[in-house]
Design a protein with these regions (language model features):
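Hydrophobic/aromatic residues within transmembrane alpha-helices
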Residues: 8, 21, 76-78, 134
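A structural preference for short, pocket-lining loop segments at secondary-structure junctions
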Residues: 1-33, 46-62, 86-89, 221-224
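C-terminal alpha-helix plus adjacent terminal tail
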Residues: 155, 159, 165-224
């Protein structure tokens, strides 16, 4: 049978995705390695764009968030057609805290969902938001209780099965009328690289602090 749905999820308890490899960012910036930064950013948008277009097939993509969803991880979730989150999940873009911005699709994906004003507020504050916060402004689609995410994914697939042909058509129309091109994503990657190479030493020190926090959070998820 043909694949009709894909689900992005995590096997790490309490963590969906903590975002990009900040240690690598610091190394590439210290070395003034523009090519390396472009290669990294391009590899990221390659993956997210394929998910965004349903891999070029009539596939509905779903992100199931059951924990921390930050930075590039949030961008990954946003690339799906449907975002389902458990209530304990948290969302945010911390990049502004070290004077950068998320450059692998965040603006494009958010703008199509919630418009410019809400997008720029989410990107420019560095705040961490609850799943209910994100549901209230239309960033995500469904919030369920802790441990109920898998069942909700199955239920969502079942609910949509009767109208699947029409829903696939609606998704195609959405991409045609208000779509995101690969060129748009790669253009923003170039803007991100330019901004990264302008970071000052104090910004890189702040980034290094977040590396330590990422490491601690990952270690905690593996213990549990």
């Amino acid at each position: 049978m043909p694949v009709e749905y894909t689900v992005l999820a995590s096997g790490a308890p309490g963590v969906f995705n903590l975002g990009g490899d900040l240690s690598l960012f610091i190394e590439l910036i210290d070395n003034r390695d523009r090519v390396g930064l472009l290669r990294y950013g391009s590899a990221c948008v390659d993956v997210l764009y394929r998910n965004y277009i349903g891999h070029g097939l009539p596939i509905t993509t779903i992100s199931l968030v059951q924990g921390e969803c930050l930075g590039g991880g949030f961008e990954a979730a946003l690339s799906s057609d449907i975002i389902i989150a458990e209530r304990q999940s948290r969302f945010g873009f911390p990049e502004i805290l070290f004077n950068l911005f998320p450059g692998m699709g965040a603006y494009s994906f958010l703008d199509r969902r919630v418009g410019r004003k809400q997008t720029e507020e989410l990107l420019s504050t560095g705040k961490i938001y609850s799943a209910d916060d994100m549901l209230a402004v239309g960033v995500i689609d469904v919030v369920v209780g802790r441990g109920e995410g898998d069942a909700e994914v199955a239920a969502a697939i079942k609910r949509s099965s009767r109208s699947r042909n029409g829903l696939v058509g609606i998704a195609g129309a959405r991409r045609r009328v208000n779509g995101i091109t690969y060129e748009e994503l790669t253009d923003v990657v170039h803007l991100w690289v330019d901004a990264a190479l302008r970071l000052a030493p104090r910004d890189l020190k702040l980034m290094q602090r977040l590396v330590s926090r990422q490491t601690d959070m990952l270690a905690s998820s593996q213990i549990h």
